[in-house]
């Protein structure tokens, strides 16, 4: 089988996904064949299996080719601190988009263009340097939170419309395809004044995407839907998707990445592949815990760490990791 599988030949790994499928399929084909395997011509069995495998691999590649974004392309992520954080963490939305595409056979390169505190005016001012000069194939545009949130220091609706339109026009003139993201919420309460003001900004973005034939990721609607509680449910304590009402936590980053991938046209089955890839990413989320110990305990930890040529923090983090695995095993099934 390996001779017929270029992916396996290239990887040379027994756990290559295509090879795993081939082996499982072979076993299934041999056990489900009505005629005993010994009475089938060996070459006929192999030929049939190979034909089905080739069909499977070809269909997988075809699905990836049907997406508007292709392998080898570059995606610029233009935005503010939400985007900057989305680039700086392995579980940030920028990297989740990249890994989600890769899980579906589309390998792309990110161009990180998020700057903390930026408004539409700021993004327009650095567009040439941070995006156009780097010649991406795609750009996602996340802008609106600071234009509203910063009040008098932000950008009113009319100049915002002008700035965003100019950003899109310049990118399209440079041959860059654009996906517009509706602005995420400012506080996890749609009834607050900032979110009410943001409605007009997002309405404009939806209209502009349609007018300029840009892809659209409906992140604001997705965020509102995720935060909606059943009727009669008690008020939620703390934030669900953000660390502070604005900047995303791991769940919020997954929400954003999901919206962007759907904007790129990924199917439900492809989204499942993306989510599965995210869930098993190593060191994706840093969980910080406060551990109080006595001086005697600290002295012992220090000696143990020194004997292993490690730091106390590394030692404690390893034990916390083991505790998380234990808790996970005892948690109720999904």
Please identify what each model-predicted range represents:
Residues 1-78, 83-90, 98-107, 133-137, ...:
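N-terminal secretory targeting modules
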Residues 66-71, 91, 95-109, 118, ...:
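Alpha-helical cap/lid subdomain in secreted, periplasmic
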């Amino acid at each position: 089988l390996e001779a017929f599988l270029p992916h396996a030949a290239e990887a040379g790994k027994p756990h290559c996904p295509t090879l795993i499928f081939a082996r499982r399929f072979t076993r299934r084909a041999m056990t489900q064949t009505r005629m005993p395997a010994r009475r089938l011509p060996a070459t006929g069995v192999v030929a049939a299996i190979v034909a089905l495998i080739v069909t499977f691999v070809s269909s997988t590649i075809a699905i990836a080719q049907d997406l508007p974004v292709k392998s080898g392309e570059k995606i610029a992520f233009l935005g503010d601190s939400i985007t900057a954080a989305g680039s700086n963490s392995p579980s940030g939305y920028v990297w989740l988009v990249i890994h989600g595409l890769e899980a579906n056979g589309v390998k792309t390169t990110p161009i990180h263009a998020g700057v903390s505190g930026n408004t539409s005016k700021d993004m327009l001012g650095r567009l040439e340097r941070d995006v156009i000069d780097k010649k991406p194939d795609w750009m996602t545009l996340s802008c609106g939170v600071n234009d509203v949130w910063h009040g008098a220091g932000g950008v009113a609706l009319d100049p915002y419309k002008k700035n965003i339109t100019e950003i899109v026009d310049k990118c399209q003139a440079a041959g860059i395809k654009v996906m517009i993201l509706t602005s995420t919420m400012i506080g996890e309460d749609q009834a607050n004044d900032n979110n009410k003001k943001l409605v007009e900004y997002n309405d404009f973005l939806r209209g502009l995407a349609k007018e300029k034939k840009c892809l659209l990721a409906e992140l604001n609607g997705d965020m509102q839907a995720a935060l909606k509680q059943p009727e009669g449910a008690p008020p939620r304590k703390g934030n669900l998707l953000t660390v502070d009402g604005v900047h995303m936590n791991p769940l919020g980053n997954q929400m954003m990445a999901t919206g962007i991938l759907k904007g790129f046209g990924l199917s439900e089955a492809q989204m499942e592949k993306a989510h599965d890839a995210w869930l098993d990413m190593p060191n994706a989320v840093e969980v910080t815990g406060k551990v109080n110990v006595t001086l005697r305990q600290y002295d012992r930890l220090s000696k143990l760490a020194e004997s292993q040529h490690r730091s106390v923090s590394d030692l404690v983090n390893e034990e916390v990791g083991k505790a998380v695995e234990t808790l996970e095993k005892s948690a109720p099934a999904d």
